[in-house]
């Protein structure tokens, strides 16, 4: 897939569109066919957070022509697909991520010592990867009981972000 262009509907597999539809329906709290600010406010509240104007603006920028149909009422599914396609086209392919994890781990295994992942992220310009990626590390890291070394589970991570 060419990352210089946004994904179009015909570049998304039917399975992936179905996954995005499921995600859309989960976000559409009031089931009106739109993800509204009210829907997201409810979701944030269940997480103990408050949706700010700034966060809403970042999610649905007014100056983005692909979201011209977004108004006060919210985001329709076609616009949601467009937004997600644009965002997903910025991610590297699975093979690129696999090669990176193998290079970091100096082997063929996708499970990499967490300290090596953190060091590589620092070399790539992240100032505080432990904090910036804390949730990701919490989900995809295990402790090796024998050595007490923390291992980033790369295959599990890749399986969760690719279809």
Swiss-Prot record:
UniProt KW keywords: Calcium, Cell cycle, Cell division, Metal-binding, Motor protein, Myosin, Repeat
Principal subcellular localisation of the protein: other
Ranges for domain EF-hand: 15-50, 92-127
Binding-site residues, Ca(2+): 28, 30, 32, 39
Any one annotated GO CC term: cellular bud neck
Subcellular location: Bud neck
GO biological process, any: mitotic cytokinesis
More about this protein: Present with 1127 molecules/cell in log phase SD medium. This chain binds calcium.
PANTHER family, per the entry: MYOSIN REGULATORY LIGHT CHAIN 2 (PTHR23049)
Protein name: Myosin light chain 2
């Amino acid at each position: 897939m060419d990352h210089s262009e946004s994904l179009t509907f015909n570049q998304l597999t039917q399975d992936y569109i179905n996954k995005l539809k499921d995600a859309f329906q989960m976000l559409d709290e009031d089931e009106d066919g739109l993800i509204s600010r009210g829907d997201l406010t409810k979701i944030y509240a269940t997480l103990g957070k408050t949706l700010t104007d700034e966060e809403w603006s970042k999610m649905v920028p007014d100056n983005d022509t692909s979201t011209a149909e977004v108004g006060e009422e919210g985001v329709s599914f076609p616009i949601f697909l467009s937004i997600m396609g644009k965002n997903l086209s910025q991610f590297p392919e699975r093979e690129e991520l696999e090669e990176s994890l193998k290079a970091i781990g100096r082997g063929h295994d996708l499970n990499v010592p967490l300290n090596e992942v953190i060091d590589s992220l620092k070399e790539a310009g992240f100032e505080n990867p432990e904090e910036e990626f804390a949730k990701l590390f919490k989900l995809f890291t295990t402790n090796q009981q024998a050595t007490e070394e923390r291992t980033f589970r790369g295959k599990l991570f890749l399986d969760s972000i690719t279809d």
